[in-house]
Amino acid sequence: MTSANCGSGDHADQLVPQLVDRLAIRELVDAYAYCADRRDAAGQMALFTEDTDFLVYMDSRDPSPTQHLRGRGALAPVFDELNTYIATMHFNGQSTAVLDGDHASGVTYCLAHHVKVDGSERSLMIAAIRYLDTFVKRNGTWFFSQRKLMVDWTETRPLVTG
Protein backbone atom coordinates (compact mmCIF):
# COMPACT_ATOMS: atom_id res chain seq x y z
CA MET A 1 0.00 0.00 0.00
CA THR A 2 1.43 3.38 -0.96
CA SER A 3 1.24 6.59 1.01
CA ALA A 4 -1.30 7.83 -1.54
CA ASN A 5 -3.60 5.01 -0.50
CA CYS A 6 -3.07 5.54 3.24
CA GLY A 7 -3.05 9.30 3.22
CA SER A 8 -0.01 11.46 2.87
CA GLY A 9 0.07 12.65 6.45
CA ASP A 10 -0.87 16.18 5.39
CA HIS A 11 -3.84 16.13 7.73
CA ALA A 12 -1.61 15.14 10.65
CA ASP A 13 0.91 17.80 9.64
CA GLN A 14 -1.85 20.40 9.94
CA LEU A 15 -3.44 18.91 13.04
CA VAL A 16 -0.35 18.69 15.25
CA PRO A 17 0.37 22.46 15.32
CA GLN A 18 -3.31 23.12 16.11
CA LEU A 19 -3.20 20.63 18.97
CA VAL A 20 -0.02 22.22 20.30
CA ASP A 21 -1.65 25.68 20.16
CA ARG A 22 -4.84 24.43 21.84
CA LEU A 23 -2.84 22.82 24.63
CA ALA A 24 -0.76 25.99 25.10
CA ILE A 25 -3.94 28.10 25.32
CA ARG A 26 -5.47 25.73 27.88
CA GLU A 27 -2.24 25.85 29.89
CA LEU A 28 -2.40 29.67 29.75
CA VAL A 29 -5.98 29.64 31.07
CA ASP A 30 -5.04 27.20 33.84
CA ALA A 31 -1.91 29.20 34.73
CA TYR A 32 -4.13 32.24 35.33
CA ALA A 33 -6.21 30.25 37.84
CA TYR A 34 -3.12 28.73 39.47
CA CYS A 35 -1.46 32.13 39.90
CA ALA A 36 -4.69 33.55 41.35
CA ASP A 37 -4.92 30.77 43.93
CA ARG A 38 -1.22 31.07 44.82
CA ARG A 39 -1.46 34.90 45.07
CA ASP A 40 1.19 35.29 42.39
CA ALA A 41 0.09 38.64 40.94
CA ALA A 42 3.37 39.08 39.04
CA GLY A 43 2.98 35.64 37.46
CA GLN A 44 -0.62 36.39 36.59
CA MET A 45 0.28 39.72 34.99
CA ALA A 46 3.00 38.05 32.89
CA LEU A 47 0.28 36.04 31.12
CA PHE A 48 -1.04 39.23 29.47
CA THR A 49 0.27 41.41 26.65
CA GLU A 50 1.65 44.82 27.60
CA ASP A 51 -1.33 46.51 25.91
CA THR A 52 -3.97 44.15 27.27
CA ASP A 53 -7.59 44.98 28.00
CA PHE A 54 -9.14 43.43 31.12
CA LEU A 55 -12.85 43.96 31.65
CA VAL A 56 -14.88 42.84 34.66
CA TYR A 57 -18.65 42.44 34.48
CA MET A 58 -19.96 41.76 38.00
CA ASP A 59 -23.38 41.21 36.36
CA SER A 60 -22.95 39.45 33.03
CA ARG A 61 -26.36 40.78 31.89
CA ASP A 62 -25.13 44.37 32.13
CA PRO A 63 -23.56 45.52 28.84
CA SER A 64 -21.26 47.96 30.67
CA PRO A 65 -18.21 46.63 32.50
CA THR A 66 -17.82 47.27 36.22
CA GLN A 67 -14.09 47.75 35.61
CA HIS A 68 -12.04 48.28 32.46
CA LEU A 69 -8.30 48.11 32.90
CA ARG A 70 -5.86 48.88 30.10
CA GLY A 71 -2.28 47.69 30.09
CA ARG A 72 -0.52 44.94 32.00
CA GLY A 73 0.57 47.28 34.80
CA ALA A 74 -3.03 48.23 35.59
CA LEU A 75 -3.85 44.64 36.54
CA ALA A 76 -1.91 44.54 39.84
CA PRO A 77 -4.65 46.08 42.04
CA VAL A 78 -7.28 43.63 40.74
CA PHE A 79 -5.07 40.61 41.33
CA ASP A 80 -3.93 41.92 44.73
CA GLU A 81 -7.61 42.15 45.73
CA LEU A 82 -7.57 38.36 46.11
CA ASN A 83 -5.47 38.89 49.25
CA THR A 84 -8.69 39.84 51.07
CA TYR A 85 -9.52 36.10 51.06
CA ILE A 86 -7.70 33.51 53.15
CA ALA A 87 -8.04 30.96 50.35
CA THR A 88 -9.38 30.66 46.83
CA MET A 89 -9.86 27.74 44.49
CA HIS A 90 -10.63 28.31 40.81
CA PHE A 91 -12.03 25.25 39.03
CA ASN A 92 -11.84 25.70 35.26
CA GLY A 93 -14.45 23.73 33.38
CA GLN A 94 -15.37 23.47 29.72
CA SER A 95 -13.64 25.75 27.28
CA THR A 96 -13.49 26.53 23.59
CA ALA A 97 -10.76 27.94 21.40
CA VAL A 98 -11.06 29.16 17.81
CA LEU A 99 -7.64 29.42 16.19
CA ASP A 100 -6.73 31.89 13.46
CA GLY A 101 -2.98 31.77 12.93
CA ASP A 102 -1.27 33.65 15.76
CA HIS A 103 -4.63 34.84 17.11
CA ALA A 104 -7.41 32.96 18.87
CA SER A 105 -10.59 33.54 20.80
CA GLY A 106 -12.26 31.39 23.39
CA VAL A 107 -14.59 30.95 26.32
CA THR A 108 -13.79 29.24 29.62
CA TYR A 109 -16.23 28.45 32.40
CA CYS A 110 -14.99 28.64 35.98
CA LEU A 111 -16.35 28.14 39.48
CA ALA A 112 -14.28 30.36 41.76
CA HIS A 113 -14.42 29.63 45.49
CA HIS A 114 -13.39 32.39 47.92
CA VAL A 115 -13.00 31.84 51.68
CA LYS A 116 -13.19 34.90 53.92
CA VAL A 117 -12.86 35.34 57.69
CA ASP A 118 -14.65 38.11 59.56
CA GLY A 119 -13.87 37.80 63.26
CA SER A 120 -14.82 34.25 64.21
CA GLU A 121 -17.09 33.82 61.18
CA ARG A 122 -15.94 32.12 58.00
CA SER A 123 -17.83 32.45 54.74
CA LEU A 124 -17.59 30.94 51.29
CA MET A 125 -18.41 32.97 48.20
CA ILE A 126 -18.72 31.02 44.98
CA ALA A 127 -18.73 32.90 41.68
CA ALA A 128 -19.83 31.33 38.41
CA ILE A 129 -17.56 32.99 35.88
CA ARG A 130 -17.27 32.91 32.11
CA TYR A 131 -14.05 34.25 30.67
CA LEU A 132 -14.36 35.62 27.13
CA ASP A 133 -10.80 35.69 25.88
CA THR A 134 -8.80 36.96 22.96
CA PHE A 135 -5.33 35.44 22.66
CA VAL A 136 -2.24 36.32 20.67
CA LYS A 137 0.91 34.29 20.06
CA ARG A 138 4.15 36.27 20.23
CA ASN A 139 7.54 34.66 19.70
CA GLY A 140 5.92 31.24 20.06
CA THR A 141 4.15 32.01 23.36
CA TRP A 142 0.42 32.58 23.83
CA PHE A 143 -0.83 35.55 25.89
CA PHE A 144 -4.16 37.09 26.80
CA SER A 145 -4.66 40.24 24.72
CA GLN A 146 -8.14 40.76 26.13
CA ARG A 147 -9.97 39.05 28.96
CA LYS A 148 -13.59 39.68 29.88
CA LEU A 149 -14.52 38.29 33.29
CA MET A 150 -18.28 37.74 33.25
CA VAL A 151 -19.90 36.91 36.60
CA ASP A 152 -23.10 34.97 35.92
CA TRP A 153 -24.01 34.47 39.57
CA THR A 154 -22.59 34.38 43.08
CA GLU A 155 -23.55 32.60 46.26
CA THR A 156 -22.28 33.44 49.73
CA ARG A 157 -22.85 31.15 52.69
CA PRO A 158 -21.37 30.39 56.10
CA LEU A 159 -18.47 27.97 55.97
CA VAL A 160 -18.72 25.40 58.72
CA THR A 161 -15.82 23.08 59.43
CA GLY A 162 -16.50 19.82 61.16
Residue ranges and their predicted role:
Residues V16-L19, D51, F79-L82, V117-S120:
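Short secondary-structure boundary micro-motifs
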Residues H11, R22-L23, F54, A76, ...:
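Generic signal for short, ordered secondary-structure residues
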Residues L15, L19, P65-L69, R122:
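Charge-dense, low-complexity intrinsically disordered segments
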Residues A41-L111:
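A solvent-exposed, acidic/Ser-Thr-rich amphipathic alpha-helical stretch
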Residues M1-E50:
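Short, low-complexity N-terminal intrinsically disordered segments enriched in polar/charged residues
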Residues T2-D13, T84-G162:
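A beta-strand edge to alpha-helix "cap/lid" segment located at domain peripheries
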Residues D21, I25, D37, H68, ...:
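Aromatic-acidic/polar surface patches that form glycan- and anion
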Residues A31, A74-P77, R130:
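Alpha-helical elements of Rossmann-like donor-binding domains used by nucleotide-donor carbohydrate transfer enzymes
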